[in-house]
UniProtKB/Swiss-Prot annotation:
The enzyme's E.C. designation: 5.3.1.9
Its biological purpose: Catalyzes the reversible isomerization of glucose-6-phosphate to fructose-6-phosphate.
Highest classification ranks of the organism: Archaea, Methanobacteriati, Methanobacteriota, Stenosarchaea group, Halobacteria
Family to which this protein belongs: Belongs to the GPI family.
S-S bridge residues: none
InterPro entries cross-referenced by the UniProt entry: G6P_Isomerase, Phosphoglucose_isomerase_CS, SIS_dom, SIS_dom_sf, SIS_PGI_1, SIS_PGI_2
Catalytic residues (positions): E271 (proton donor), H292, H303, K403
Matching PROSITE patterns: P_GLUCOSE_ISOMERASE_1, P_GLUCOSE_ISOMERASE_3
Protein name: Probable glucose-6-phosphate isomerase
GO MF, one annotated term: monosaccharide binding
GO CC field: cytosol
Gene name of the record: pgi
Involved pathway(s): Carbohydrate biosynthesis; gluconeogenesis; Carbohydrate degradation; glycolysis; D-glyceraldehyde 3-phosphate and glycerone phosphate from D-glucose: step 2/4
Gene3D superfamilies given in the database record: Glucose-6-phosphate isomerase like protein, domain 1
Length: 430
C-alpha cells in the first residue's frame, strides 16, 4: 500500500515533518521489538509470521470434500468471523456459494437465514479457539438442530476451526469432523491470514495462496523507518495525532468491496489499543455514501479526529451513458469509477481546507495480493501504534469481563461479574 501523510502537517491537530523525524527514532526501536517478537514467535507477534507458517495445502485438502455448496455458514464471533467476512466481501463474487455470517445471536436474523437456504447444500464452518464461546456454540447448536430436523446429516456438512483442546475439538474427534487448528499465539483479530479466515475463502473459491503472497511481500518490505515502511508511517502518524487530540479515527474506503475491511479495522484498532484510558476510537464510513451525511461532522465538527481515506488505483470500468437531461450532460461518457475518484479527491480537499488531518491510503487494486498486503500492513501499523503507546496490544481484558458477566447471567455461578448487572443504578422513563 501507499500512504500519503502530506495533509497532516498543516492540520489541527497536526504533526510536523520534524516531529515525525524525531518520532522515527522510536519507530526504529518499535521495529526492533517487532522483529524480535517475530523471530521468537512470541504470542501476538506470531501473527506476523503467518505468511511463512500457514499451510494453504492443508486448508484446500480439508475443504475438498465439500463439492459445489450452495451456501456457507460462518459460525463465529469477532475475529473468528470478521476476517473471513472481509475476504469474502472484498474478493468474492455473486455466484454460488452464498456466504452468511452468524456472528450474533439475534433469533430473528438466525431464523431468517436458516429458512432461506438449502441446508442439504450448505457447509457449516464453526470457528472458536476456546471451543466454549457462548454465542458461537449456541448458534452451532441451533444450526445443527435445524439440519437434523431437515433430514440432513450435519456431520457431512461441518468443518471445525478451533484450538488443540476444548469442547469443539472433542466434538470433532468424536464425530470424525474435518478440523483445522487455530494457530497458537495469534489473537483472533490478527487471524485473518490463518485457518480462521482462509477456510471460508477457500470454500468460496478465492485464491488464498495469492493472499499469502501479498502478505509475504509486505512482510519482506518492513524496515526500521516510517519513511520507508507504509505500515509504520500509518501507525506512527495516527499515534502522534492521537497524542495531540485526534482521539477518533474514521476509516472511509471509497470501494464497497472494502466496507467490511473498515469493520475489521474497527475491531483491530479498538480491541488492541483501547487500554488504560487510552486509545483511538475507530469509526466505519463508506465513500461516497457517507460524505452525504457524516462528512458534515468530520469537516465542521470538533477537531478531534483523523480521517483515513482509502481507495484502489485501478477499478472495473462502467461507462455512464450520455444523456440530454438538463444539467447532466457533463456525466455522459464518463465512468462510475471516475466519478467515485472525483468524490474521493473532493472529500479529501474539503477536509484539508478545514484543517482536518487526513491520511490517504492507496492500493493497486482490490485483488488477492493487494488485499493480503493491506491486511498485513494494517496489523503491523496497529502493533507499531501499540509499541509507541506502551499498551499491551494483544490482550483484551474488557472483552473478557463482558464474556464472564454474560455466562454468570446465564447461570454459571463461577463468574461473579454478573453481580454488577444487578447492582447498577437505574432511572427508567416509560
Amino acid at each position: 500500500m501507499q500512504v500519503d501523510l502530506g495533509t497532516v502537517f498543516d492540520a489541527t491537530p497536526g504533526v510536523t515533518q520534524d516531529g515525525l523525524e524525531r518520532l522515527d527514532e522510536r519507530v526504529a526501536t518499535a521495529h526492533e521489538r517487532i522483529e524480535r517478537g517475530r523471530r521468537n514467535n512470541e504470542p501476538g507477534y506470531a501473527a506476523l509470521n503467518l505468511p511463512e507458517t500457514v499451510d494453504t495445502t492443508t486448508i484446500h485438502d480439508a475443504v475438498a470434500s465439500f463439492e459445489d455448496p450452495t451456501a456457507i455458514l460462518i459460525v463465529g464471533i469477532g475475529g473468528s468471523a470478521l476476517g473471513a467476512a472481509t475476504l469474502v466481501d472484498a474478493l468474492g463474487d455473486d455466484t454460488a456459494p452464498s456466504v452468511y455470517v452468524l456472528d450474533n445471536v439475534d433469533p430473528a436474523s438466525i431464523s431468517r437465514i436458516l429458512e432461506s437456504i438449502p441446508l442439504s447444500e450448505t457447509v457449516l464452518n464453526v470457528v472458536s479457539r476456546s471451543g466454549t464461546t457462548a454465542e458461537t456454540l449456541s448458534n452451532f447448536l441451533v444450526v445443527r438442530e435445524a439440519m437434523t430436523k431437515a433430514g440432513v446429516d450435519w456431520t457431512d456438512r461441518t468443518i471445525v476451526t478451533t484450538g488443540t483442546d476444548g469442547n469443539l475439538r472433542q466434538l470433532a474427534k468424536s464425530e470424525s469432523l474435518p478440523a483445522l487448528s487455530v494457530p497458537e499465539g495469534v489473537p483472533g483479530r490478527f487471524s485473518v491470514l490463518s485457518t480462521v479466515g482462509l477456510v471460508v475463502a477457500a470454500l468460496k473459491g478465492i485464491q488464498i495462496s495469492e493472499l499469502i503472497t501479498g502478505a509475504a511481500d509486505a512482510a519482506a518490505e518492513l524496515s526500521g523507518s516510517l519513511f520507508e515502511t507504509p505500515a509504520y508511517a500509518y501507525g506512527a502518524t495516527t499515534y502522534a495525532l492521537a497524542t495531540r487530540g485526534a482521539r477518533t479515527n474514521v476509516m472511509m474506503p471509497y470501494a464497497e468491496n472494502l466496507e467490511t475491511f473498515a469493520e475489521w479495522f474497527a475491531q483491530l484498532w479498538a480491541e488492541s489499543l483501547g487500554k488504560d484510558n487510552r486509545g483511538q476510537t475507530p469509526i466505519r464510513a463508506l465513500g461516497a455514501t457517507d460524505q452525504h451525511s457524516q462528512l458534515q461532522l468530520y469537516r465542521a465538527g470538533p477537531h478531534n479526529k483523523v480521517i483515513t481515506l482509502i481507495r484502489p488505483r485501478n477499478r472495473p470500468s462502467c461507462t455512464i451513458p450520455s444523456t440530454d437531461l438538463d444539467g447532466l450532460s457533463y456525466l455522459g461518457g464518463s465512468d462510475l469509477g471516475s466519478l467515485l475518484d472525483a468524490e474521493f479527491e473532493a472529500t479529501e480537499a474539503s477536509l484539508v481546507d478545514a484543517d482536518i488531518p487526513t491520511i490517504r491510503v492507496e492500493i493497486n487494486a482490490i485483488d488477492a495480493q493487494s488485499l493480503g498486503a493491506l491486511l498485513y500492513e494494517f496489523e503491523v501499523a496497529c502493533i507499531c501504534y501499540g509499541e509507541l503507546a506502551s499498551v499491551p496490544t494483544f490482550t483484551q481484558p474488557a472483552v473478557e469481563w463482558g464474556k464472564r458477566a454474560a455466562r454468570g447471567l446465564l447461570g454459571d455461578d463461577k463468574f461473579m461479574e454478573a453481580a454488577a448487572v444487578a447492582d447498577k443504578p437505574t432511572l427508567r422513563v416509560e
